[in-house]
Protein backbone atom coordinates (compact mmCIF):
# COMPACT_ATOMS: atom_id res chain seq x y z
CA UNK A 1 0.00 0.00 0.00
CA UNK A 2 1.29 3.43 -0.88
CA UNK A 3 0.20 6.36 1.27
CA UNK A 4 -0.17 9.53 -0.78
CA UNK A 5 -0.21 12.74 1.23
CA UNK A 6 -2.11 15.59 -0.36
CA UNK A 7 -2.03 19.30 0.49
CA UNK A 8 -3.35 20.48 3.83
CA UNK A 9 -7.12 20.74 3.86
CA UNK A 10 -7.64 18.21 1.08
CA UNK A 11 -9.04 14.73 1.62
CA UNK A 12 -6.71 11.91 2.54
CA UNK A 13 -6.27 9.32 -0.18
CA UNK A 14 -4.92 5.86 0.49
CA UNK A 15 -4.27 3.61 -2.46
CA UNK A 16 -3.75 -0.10 -2.12
CA UNK A 17 -0.95 -1.32 -4.35
CA UNK A 18 -0.80 -4.87 -3.09
CA UNK A 19 -1.13 -6.34 0.38
CA UNK A 20 -2.20 -4.68 3.61
CA UNK A 21 0.28 -2.52 5.47
CA UNK A 22 0.97 -3.45 9.08
CA UNK A 23 1.63 0.19 9.96
CA UNK A 24 -1.18 2.16 11.55
CA UNK A 25 -2.86 4.86 9.53
CA UNK A 26 -1.35 7.40 11.93
CA UNK A 27 2.13 6.35 10.89
CA UNK A 28 1.16 6.37 7.22
CA UNK A 29 -0.47 9.82 7.29
CA UNK A 30 1.90 11.91 9.37
CA UNK A 31 5.18 13.56 8.61
CA UNK A 32 8.27 12.67 10.56
CA UNK A 33 10.49 14.29 13.15
CA UNK A 34 13.92 13.24 14.31
CA UNK A 35 16.18 14.09 17.21
CA UNK A 36 19.89 13.62 17.76
CA UNK A 37 21.27 10.90 19.98
CA UNK A 38 22.97 11.66 23.26
CA UNK A 39 26.68 12.40 23.16
CA UNK A 40 28.75 12.59 26.31
CA UNK A 41 27.59 13.69 29.74
CA UNK A 42 24.47 15.75 30.45
CA UNK A 43 22.83 16.98 33.62
CA UNK A 44 19.18 17.83 34.21
CA UNK A 45 16.64 18.34 36.95
CA UNK A 46 14.23 15.70 35.59
CA UNK A 47 15.08 12.75 33.34
CA UNK A 48 12.16 11.16 31.49
CA UNK A 49 12.71 7.65 30.11
CA UNK A 50 10.30 6.76 27.31
CA UNK A 51 9.23 8.71 24.23
CA UNK A 52 5.60 7.72 23.88
CA UNK A 53 2.66 9.98 24.59
CA UNK A 54 3.08 9.88 28.38
CA UNK A 55 6.75 10.81 28.28
CA UNK A 56 6.29 13.55 25.68
CA UNK A 57 3.38 15.13 27.55
CA UNK A 58 5.37 15.03 30.81
CA UNK A 59 8.28 16.79 29.08
CA UNK A 60 5.88 19.34 27.61
CA UNK A 61 4.24 20.11 30.96
CA UNK A 62 7.61 20.38 32.73
CA UNK A 63 9.08 22.69 30.12
CA UNK A 64 5.95 24.85 30.24
CA UNK A 65 6.45 25.09 34.02
CA UNK A 66 10.06 26.18 33.60
CA UNK A 67 11.56 22.89 34.80
CA UNK A 68 14.78 21.68 33.18
CA UNK A 69 14.25 18.18 31.77
CA UNK A 70 15.61 15.67 29.26
CA UNK A 71 13.67 12.87 27.54
CA UNK A 72 15.47 9.80 26.20
CA UNK A 73 13.94 7.23 23.84
CA UNK A 74 15.63 3.93 22.92
CA UNK A 75 14.16 4.01 19.41
CA UNK A 76 12.24 6.92 17.85
CA UNK A 77 9.52 8.87 19.62
CA UNK A 78 6.01 7.46 19.21
CA UNK A 79 7.42 4.28 17.63
CA UNK A 80 5.83 1.94 20.17
CA UNK A 81 2.30 1.64 21.49
CA UNK A 82 1.44 5.30 20.89
CA UNK A 83 1.44 4.93 17.10
CA UNK A 84 -0.96 1.97 17.31
CA UNK A 85 -3.79 3.56 19.29
CA UNK A 86 -7.30 4.21 18.01
CA UNK A 87 -6.88 7.70 19.52
CA UNK A 88 -10.09 8.27 21.45
CA UNK A 89 -10.04 10.92 24.18
CA UNK A 90 -12.96 10.05 26.40
CA UNK A 91 -14.47 9.32 29.77
CA UNK A 92 -16.20 6.35 28.13
CA UNK A 93 -13.65 3.74 29.15
CA UNK A 94 -15.96 0.77 29.54
CA UNK A 95 -18.47 0.42 32.35
CA UNK A 96 -16.23 1.79 35.10
CA UNK A 97 -18.20 4.27 37.06
CA UNK A 98 -20.94 2.33 38.81
CA UNK A 99 -18.27 -0.16 39.82
CA UNK A 100 -16.01 2.62 41.12
CA UNK A 101 -18.87 4.24 42.99
CA UNK A 102 -19.43 1.07 45.01
CA UNK A 103 -15.79 0.00 45.28
CA UNK A 104 -14.17 3.32 46.20
CA UNK A 105 -17.01 5.57 47.29
CA UNK A 106 -18.36 8.74 45.73
CA UNK A 107 -15.53 11.09 46.71
CA UNK A 108 -12.68 9.05 45.24
CA UNK A 109 -14.66 8.12 42.13
CA UNK A 110 -15.52 11.80 41.56
CA UNK A 111 -11.83 12.67 41.64
CA UNK A 112 -11.08 10.03 39.01
CA UNK A 113 -13.83 11.44 36.79
CA UNK A 114 -12.63 15.01 37.32
CA UNK A 115 -9.08 14.05 36.32
CA UNK A 116 -10.36 12.50 33.09
CA UNK A 117 -12.58 15.49 32.35
CA UNK A 118 -9.68 17.90 32.92
CA UNK A 119 -7.53 15.87 30.52
CA UNK A 120 -10.13 16.20 27.76
CA UNK A 121 -10.33 19.95 28.36
CA UNK A 122 -6.53 20.23 28.17
CA UNK A 123 -6.45 18.42 24.83
CA UNK A 124 -9.22 20.66 23.53
CA UNK A 125 -7.25 23.75 24.50
CA UNK A 126 -3.93 22.54 23.05
CA UNK A 127 -5.48 21.26 19.82
CA UNK A 128 -6.75 24.73 18.92
CA UNK A 129 -3.22 25.60 17.82
CA UNK A 130 -2.27 22.23 16.29
CA UNK A 131 -3.43 20.75 12.99
CA UNK A 132 -4.19 17.25 14.30
CA UNK A 133 -7.69 16.44 12.96
CA UNK A 134 -9.18 17.05 16.40
CA UNK A 135 -12.95 16.47 16.47
CA UNK A 136 -15.50 16.66 19.25
CA UNK A 137 -17.60 13.48 19.26
CA UNK A 138 -20.14 11.71 21.40
CA UNK A 139 -18.79 8.56 23.02
CA UNK A 140 -20.83 5.36 23.45
CA UNK A 141 -20.17 2.31 25.63
CA UNK A 142 -22.58 -0.42 24.59
CA UNK A 143 -23.68 -3.77 25.98
CA UNK A 144 -24.97 -6.57 23.80
CA UNK A 145 -27.20 -8.13 26.42
CA UNK A 146 -27.40 -6.17 29.69
CA UNK A 147 -29.61 -3.08 29.67
CA UNK A 148 -29.55 -2.88 33.47
CA UNK A 149 -25.77 -2.40 33.56
CA UNK A 150 -26.09 0.47 31.10
CA UNK A 151 -28.82 2.16 33.14
CA UNK A 152 -26.74 1.88 36.33
CA UNK A 153 -23.72 3.35 34.56
CA UNK A 154 -25.75 6.32 33.33
CA UNK A 155 -27.01 6.91 36.87
CA UNK A 156 -23.46 6.78 38.27
CA UNK A 157 -22.14 9.27 35.71
CA UNK A 158 -25.01 11.63 36.44
CA UNK A 159 -24.11 11.49 40.13
CA UNK A 160 -20.62 12.64 39.12
CA UNK A 161 -22.04 15.56 37.16
CA UNK A 162 -21.37 14.07 33.72
CA UNK A 163 -23.99 14.56 31.02
CA UNK A 164 -24.66 10.90 30.21
CA UNK A 165 -27.80 9.30 28.81
CA UNK A 166 -29.18 5.97 27.68
CA UNK A 167 -28.94 5.32 23.93
CA UNK A 168 -30.01 2.53 21.60
CA UNK A 169 -26.85 3.10 19.49
CA UNK A 170 -28.65 2.67 16.18
CA UNK A 171 -25.52 3.49 14.15
CA UNK A 172 -24.07 0.09 15.01
CA UNK A 173 -24.56 -2.69 12.45
CA UNK A 174 -26.16 -4.94 15.08
CA UNK A 175 -28.70 -4.54 17.85
CA UNK A 176 -27.60 -3.91 21.43
CA UNK A 177 -29.30 -3.89 24.82
CA UNK A 178 -28.28 -0.27 25.20
CA UNK A 179 -25.38 2.15 25.39
CA UNK A 180 -24.09 4.91 27.63
CA UNK A 181 -23.86 8.13 25.63
CA UNK A 182 -21.43 10.80 26.84
CA UNK A 183 -21.40 14.10 24.99
CA UNK A 184 -18.40 16.30 24.30
CA UNK A 185 -15.65 13.68 24.00
CA UNK A 186 -12.99 13.76 21.27
CA UNK A 187 -10.81 11.97 18.75
CA UNK A 188 -7.68 13.13 16.92
CA UNK A 189 -4.57 12.17 14.96
CA UNK A 190 -2.09 11.35 17.75
CA UNK A 191 1.14 11.61 15.78
CA UNK A 192 0.29 14.95 14.18
CA UNK A 193 -0.43 16.23 17.68
CA UNK A 194 2.64 14.76 19.35
CA UNK A 195 5.14 15.62 16.63
CA UNK A 196 4.10 19.25 16.98
CA UNK A 197 4.23 19.12 20.78
CA UNK A 198 7.65 17.43 20.73
CA UNK A 199 9.49 19.56 18.19
CA UNK A 200 10.94 22.03 20.70
CA UNK A 201 11.49 19.60 23.57
CA UNK A 202 14.92 18.37 24.79
CA UNK A 203 14.73 14.85 23.35
CA UNK A 204 17.43 12.30 22.51
CA UNK A 205 16.42 9.40 20.27
CA UNK A 206 18.20 6.06 19.84
CA UNK A 207 19.46 6.59 23.38
CA UNK A 208 18.84 3.49 25.45
CA UNK A 209 19.18 3.45 29.23
CA UNK A 210 21.43 0.51 30.08
CA UNK A 211 21.78 1.04 33.80
CA UNK A 212 20.00 3.18 36.38
CA UNK A 213 21.65 4.05 39.65
CA UNK A 214 20.51 6.78 42.05
CA UNK A 215 20.53 10.07 40.17
CA UNK A 216 22.51 8.71 37.23
CA UNK A 217 21.47 6.97 34.00
CA UNK A 218 24.05 5.18 31.90
CA UNK A 219 23.01 5.01 28.24
CA UNK A 220 24.50 3.53 25.10
CA UNK A 221 25.74 6.99 24.13
CA UNK A 222 26.64 8.70 27.37
CA UNK A 223 25.59 9.48 30.91
CA UNK A 224 22.85 11.71 32.32
CA UNK A 225 22.78 12.86 35.92
CA UNK A 226 19.45 14.00 37.33
CA UNK A 227 17.59 15.01 40.46
CA UNK A 228 14.25 13.36 39.64
CA UNK A 229 13.33 10.47 37.32
CA UNK A 230 10.08 9.72 35.46
CA UNK A 231 9.70 6.21 34.04
CA UNK A 232 7.29 6.30 31.08
CA UNK A 233 8.32 3.11 29.28
CA UNK A 234 4.87 1.52 28.88
CA UNK A 235 5.74 -1.37 31.25
CA UNK A 236 8.05 -0.09 34.03
CA UNK A 237 11.72 -1.03 33.68
CA UNK A 238 12.64 -1.46 37.36
CA UNK A 239 11.96 -5.06 38.46
CA UNK A 240 13.38 -4.60 41.94
CA UNK A 241 10.83 -2.07 43.16
CA UNK A 242 7.08 -1.61 42.99
CA UNK A 243 6.11 -5.24 42.14
CA UNK A 244 4.77 -4.15 38.75
CA UNK A 245 5.33 -7.66 37.41
CA UNK A 246 2.48 -8.69 39.73
CA UNK A 247 0.37 -5.52 39.54
CA UNK A 248 0.20 -5.42 35.72
CA UNK A 249 -0.56 -7.73 32.83
CA UNK A 250 -0.67 -6.93 29.12
CA UNK A 251 -3.58 -7.21 26.71
CA UNK A 252 -3.27 -7.41 22.94
CA UNK A 253 -5.89 -6.11 20.48
CA UNK A 254 -6.20 -5.55 16.74
CA UNK A 255 -7.44 -2.89 14.33
CA UNK A 256 -8.43 -2.84 10.67
CA UNK A 257 -9.11 0.34 8.69
CA UNK A 258 -12.01 -0.09 6.27
CA UNK A 259 -12.52 2.01 3.16
CA UNK A 260 -16.10 2.06 1.88
CA UNK A 261 -17.78 1.34 5.23
CA UNK A 262 -20.50 3.67 6.55
CA UNK A 263 -19.47 6.83 8.36
CA UNK A 264 -20.25 6.85 12.10
CA UNK A 265 -20.98 10.07 13.92
CA UNK A 266 -19.93 8.69 17.30
CA UNK A 267 -17.15 6.63 18.88
CA UNK A 268 -18.23 3.19 20.11
CA UNK A 269 -16.72 0.57 22.40
CA UNK A 270 -18.14 -2.67 23.79
CA UNK A 271 -18.22 -2.97 27.57
CA UNK A 272 -16.61 -6.41 27.14
CA UNK A 273 -12.83 -6.76 26.76
CA UNK A 274 -13.44 -9.15 23.87
CA UNK A 275 -15.90 -6.87 22.05
CA UNK A 276 -15.56 -4.43 19.16
CA UNK A 277 -14.81 -0.72 18.92
CA UNK A 278 -15.65 1.72 16.12
CA UNK A 279 -14.51 5.20 15.10
CA UNK A 280 -13.96 7.01 11.83
CA UNK A 281 -10.90 8.80 10.56
CA UNK A 282 -11.51 10.75 7.38
CA UNK A 283 -13.15 8.25 4.99
CA UNK A 284 -11.98 5.19 6.92
CA UNK A 285 -13.79 3.21 9.61
CA UNK A 286 -11.43 1.90 12.29
CA UNK A 287 -12.72 -1.42 13.60
CA UNK A 288 -10.99 -2.72 16.72
CA UNK A 289 -11.27 -6.00 18.60
CA UNK A 290 -10.01 -9.58 18.64
CA UNK A 291 -8.49 -8.92 22.04
CA UNK A 292 -6.73 -11.38 24.33
CA UNK A 293 -4.15 -11.49 27.08
CA UNK A 294 -0.69 -11.31 25.51
CA UNK A 295 0.67 -14.82 25.09
CA UNK A 296 -2.82 -16.35 24.92
CA UNK A 297 -5.00 -17.19 21.93
CA UNK A 298 -7.53 -14.68 20.63
CA UNK A 299 -9.61 -13.65 17.65
CA UNK A 300 -6.90 -11.40 16.19
CA UNK A 301 -7.44 -9.89 12.73
CA UNK A 302 -9.37 -12.92 11.51
CA UNK A 303 -12.28 -12.05 13.81
CA UNK A 304 -12.35 -8.48 12.52
CA UNK A 305 -12.06 -9.49 8.88
CA UNK A 306 -14.93 -11.97 9.21
CA UNK A 307 -17.09 -9.33 10.89
CA UNK A 308 -16.30 -6.80 8.16
CA UNK A 309 -17.08 -9.33 5.43
CA UNK A 310 -20.50 -9.99 6.98
CA UNK A 311 -21.53 -6.43 7.89
CA UNK A 312 -19.59 -4.31 5.38
CA UNK A 313 -19.33 -6.56 2.30
CA UNK A 314 -18.40 -3.70 -0.03
CA UNK A 315 -15.63 -2.32 2.19
CA UNK A 316 -11.95 -2.92 1.56
CA UNK A 317 -9.20 -3.23 4.16
CA UNK A 318 -6.86 -0.26 3.74
CA UNK A 319 -4.58 -1.04 6.67
CA UNK A 320 -4.33 -3.23 9.74
CA UNK A 321 -2.23 -3.17 12.87
CA UNK A 322 -2.13 -4.36 16.47
CA UNK A 323 -1.56 -2.75 19.84
CA UNK A 324 -0.82 -3.74 23.40
CA UNK A 325 -1.97 -2.28 26.71
CA UNK A 326 -0.87 -2.56 30.33
CA UNK A 327 -3.79 -3.45 32.58
CA UNK A 328 -3.99 -2.71 36.31
CA UNK A 329 -5.70 -4.60 39.10
CA UNK A 330 -8.48 -2.08 39.78
CA UNK A 331 -9.04 -0.21 36.48
CA UNK A 332 -7.08 2.85 37.70
CA UNK A 333 -3.63 3.65 36.23
CA UNK A 334 -0.49 3.73 38.35
CA UNK A 335 0.70 7.34 38.34
CA UNK A 336 3.00 8.75 41.00
CA UNK A 337 5.95 7.69 43.11
CA UNK A 338 7.44 4.49 41.68
CA UNK A 339 7.47 2.83 45.11
CA UNK A 340 7.77 3.78 48.76
CA UNK A 341 11.46 2.83 48.62
CA UNK A 342 12.40 4.96 45.60
CA UNK A 343 12.21 8.65 46.48
CA UNK A 344 12.59 11.02 43.53
CA UNK A 345 11.49 8.31 41.06
CA UNK A 346 8.04 8.45 39.47
CA UNK A 347 6.05 6.30 37.06
CA UNK A 348 3.14 6.44 34.62
CA UNK A 349 1.77 3.08 33.50
CA UNK A 350 -1.30 0.86 33.36
CA UNK A 351 -3.56 3.03 31.24
CA UNK A 352 -6.01 0.14 30.70
CA UNK A 353 -6.44 0.74 26.93
CA UNK A 354 -7.12 4.46 27.40
CA UNK A 355 -3.65 5.88 26.98
CA UNK A 356 -4.62 9.12 25.28
CA UNK A 357 -6.73 10.41 28.15
CA UNK A 358 -4.67 8.92 30.96
CA UNK A 359 -1.33 10.08 29.56
CA UNK A 360 -2.57 13.65 29.91
CA UNK A 361 -3.76 12.87 33.45
CA UNK A 362 -0.29 11.49 34.21
CA UNK A 363 1.51 14.52 32.81
CA UNK A 364 -0.45 16.91 35.02
CA UNK A 365 0.00 14.82 38.18
CA UNK A 366 3.70 14.12 37.68
CA UNK A 367 4.50 17.71 36.77
CA UNK A 368 3.25 18.68 40.22
CA UNK A 369 4.84 15.80 42.12
CA UNK A 370 8.36 16.27 40.76
CA UNK A 371 8.16 19.90 41.92
CA UNK A 372 7.08 18.83 45.40
CA UNK A 373 3.61 20.26 44.93
CA UNK A 374 0.40 18.65 46.12
CA UNK A 375 -1.98 17.33 43.49
CA UNK A 376 -5.62 16.63 44.30
CA UNK A 377 -5.61 13.46 42.18
CA UNK A 378 -2.35 11.93 43.44
CA UNK A 379 -3.88 9.61 46.05
CA UNK A 380 -6.42 8.20 43.59
CA UNK A 381 -3.72 7.13 41.12
CA UNK A 382 -0.93 6.34 43.61
CA UNK A 383 0.96 3.15 42.65
CA UNK A 384 1.35 2.39 46.37
CA UNK A 385 -2.39 2.33 47.07
CA UNK A 386 -3.72 -0.76 48.82
CA UNK A 387 -4.76 -3.25 46.16
CA UNK A 388 -5.91 -6.80 46.53
CA UNK A 389 -8.07 -7.98 43.68
CA UNK A 390 -8.69 -11.41 42.12
CA UNK A 391 -6.57 -10.29 39.15
CA UNK A 392 -3.52 -10.21 41.44
CA UNK A 393 -3.95 -13.92 42.10
CA UNK A 394 -4.41 -14.60 38.38
CA UNK A 395 -1.25 -12.64 37.54
CA UNK A 396 0.74 -14.59 40.11
CA UNK A 397 -0.71 -17.86 38.78
CA UNK A 398 0.24 -16.98 35.19
CA UNK A 399 3.78 -16.21 36.33
CA UNK A 400 4.02 -19.49 38.20
CA UNK A 401 2.71 -21.49 35.24
CA UNK A 402 5.08 -19.66 32.91
CA UNK A 403 8.07 -20.35 35.11
CA UNK A 404 7.22 -24.04 35.55
CA UNK A 405 6.39 -24.76 31.90
CA UNK A 406 9.29 -26.98 30.71
CA UNK A 407 9.69 -25.46 27.26
CA UNK A 408 11.98 -23.10 25.45
CA UNK A 409 12.47 -20.38 24.43
CA UNK A 410 12.15 -18.46 27.65
CA UNK A 411 11.71 -14.76 28.22
CA UNK A 412 14.88 -12.94 29.33
CA UNK A 413 12.79 -10.67 31.56
CA UNK A 414 11.95 -13.12 34.37
CA UNK A 415 12.27 -16.51 32.68
CA UNK A 416 8.70 -17.38 31.69
CA UNK A 417 8.07 -19.73 28.76
CA UNK A 418 7.30 -17.86 25.54
CA UNK A 419 4.31 -18.76 23.35
CA UNK A 420 4.28 -18.56 19.56
CA UNK A 421 1.75 -16.10 18.09
CA UNK A 422 0.94 -17.47 14.63
CA UNK A 423 -1.16 -14.44 13.66
CA UNK A 424 1.77 -12.04 14.04
CA UNK A 425 4.68 -14.52 13.78
CA UNK A 426 6.07 -13.49 17.14
CA UNK A 427 7.09 -15.07 20.43
CA UNK A 428 4.98 -13.61 23.27
CA UNK A 429 5.29 -13.85 27.05
CA UNK A 430 1.98 -14.68 28.79
CA UNK A 431 3.37 -13.58 32.16
CA UNK A 432 4.29 -9.95 31.58
CA UNK A 433 3.80 -9.30 27.86
CA UNK A 434 7.28 -9.08 26.34
CA UNK A 435 7.32 -9.87 22.63
CA UNK A 436 10.01 -10.90 20.14
CA UNK A 437 10.03 -11.42 16.41
CA UNK A 438 10.99 -14.77 14.90
CA UNK A 439 14.66 -13.77 14.97
CA UNK A 440 14.61 -12.82 18.65
CA UNK A 441 14.51 -9.06 18.17
CA UNK A 442 12.69 -7.33 21.01
CA UNK A 443 9.35 -5.77 20.04
CA UNK A 444 7.64 -4.94 23.35
CA UNK A 445 8.95 -4.63 26.92
CA UNK A 446 9.33 -5.30 29.88
CA UNK A 447 12.25 -7.39 28.55
CA UNK A 448 15.15 -5.02 27.97
CA UNK A 449 17.13 -6.88 25.31
CA UNK A 450 16.81 -9.15 22.30
CA UNK A 451 16.49 -12.91 22.77
CA UNK A 452 20.01 -13.90 21.79
CA UNK A 453 19.35 -17.65 21.59
CA UNK A 454 17.26 -16.96 18.46
CA UNK A 455 20.17 -15.38 16.62
PLM features: residue spans?
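Helical element adjacent to the flavin cofactor pocket in flavoenzyme catalytic cores
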Residues: 156, 179-215, 220, 224-227
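C-terminal catalytic lobe of FAD-dependent flavoproteins
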Residues: 315-392, 407
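N-terminal Rossmann-like FAD-binding beta1-loop-alpha1 element of flavoenzymes
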Residues: 46-71
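Extreme N-terminal leader/targeting segments of oxidoreductases
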Residues: 3, 13-46
Amino acid sequence: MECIRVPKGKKLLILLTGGNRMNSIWKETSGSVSFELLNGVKSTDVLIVGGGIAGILCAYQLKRSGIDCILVEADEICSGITQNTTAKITLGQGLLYNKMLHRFGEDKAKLFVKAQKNAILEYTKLAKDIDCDFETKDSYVYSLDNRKKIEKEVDALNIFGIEASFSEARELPFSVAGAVRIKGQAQFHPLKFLYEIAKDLPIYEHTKVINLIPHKAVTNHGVITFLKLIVATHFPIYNKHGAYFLKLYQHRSYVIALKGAPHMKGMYVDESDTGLSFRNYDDLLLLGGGGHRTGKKGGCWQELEEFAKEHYPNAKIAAKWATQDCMTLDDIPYIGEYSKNTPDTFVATGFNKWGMTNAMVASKILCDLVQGKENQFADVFSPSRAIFRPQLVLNALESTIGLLTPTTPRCPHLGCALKYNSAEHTWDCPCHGSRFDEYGNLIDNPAADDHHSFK
